[in-house]
Amino acid sequence: MGDPKKPRKKWMGPKHPWIKERLVRELELVGRYGLRNKRELWKLETLARYFRHRARSLLALPPEVREKEEKALLARLNELGVLPENATLDDVLNLTAEHFLERRLQTIVYKKGLARTIYEARQLIVHGHIAIAGRKIRSPGYLVKKDEEDLVDYAPTSPYAKRRLEEQVQQEEAAS
């Protein structure tokens, strides 16, 4: 049978460790998006780099060959919600890690108002208070697809969901 394959790391760190502009930019992104460490940022930079590389390789192909793969690449990025439907390969070449940081579950929970801070959003997710379509997701780095975005809410078993339901009932009683 053989041994299972060794899991490879899914990120590539910076080529030079002490470039001040990069360090300042990374620190600002870590703070703004509530990341635990820079490795979380580097994973998304690697993902953006992968899609940019695919776009460059597609641009090198003849037009009749690249058409099918170009549609698949753009459809994937549209499904993730990173690019709009009418995007082109030039838009893919402009992708950055920030495009993917905006699609993280942690960021979406904060922007939907389910948490007061980005750090509270991370804690709610890790503690199992957030679900997508009723399914608990405990990974703050989960990339939320465009069609899942409306389904992000408190988990049905969470005390936060029960508290919000009680508040809604009280508001309805007060209104009537």
Swiss-Prot record:
Biological processes annotated in GO: ribosomal small subunit biogenesis; translation
InterPro entries listed in its UniProt record: Ribosomal_uS4, Ribosomal_uS4_arc, Ribosomal_uS4_CS, Ribosomal_uS4_euk/arc, Ribosomal_uS4_N, S4_RNA-bd, S4_RNA-bd_sf
Domain S4 RNA-binding: 103-165
Keyword check for Lipid metabolism: no
Keyword annotations from UniProtKB, A to Z: Ribonucleoprotein, Ribosomal protein, RNA-binding, rRNA-binding
GO MF terms held by the record: rRNA binding; structural constituent of ribosome
Gene Ontology, cellular component aspect: small ribosomal subunit
UniProt similarity note: Belongs to the universal ribosomal protein uS4 family.
NCBIfam families assigned to the protein according to its UniProt record, in alphabetical order: PRK04051.1, uS4_arch
Free-text function comment from the UniProt entry: One of the primary rRNA binding proteins, it binds directly to 16S rRNA where it nucleates assembly of the body of the 30S subunit.
Subunit organization: Part of the 30S ribosomal subunit. Contacts protein S5. The interaction surface between S4 and S5 is involved in control of translational fidelity.
Protein name, UniProt field: Small ribosomal subunit protein uS4
Originating organism: Hyperthermus butylicus (strain DSM 5456 / JCM 9403 / PLM1-5)
Lineage: Archaea, Thermoproteota, Thermoprotei, Desulfurococcales, Pyrodictiaceae
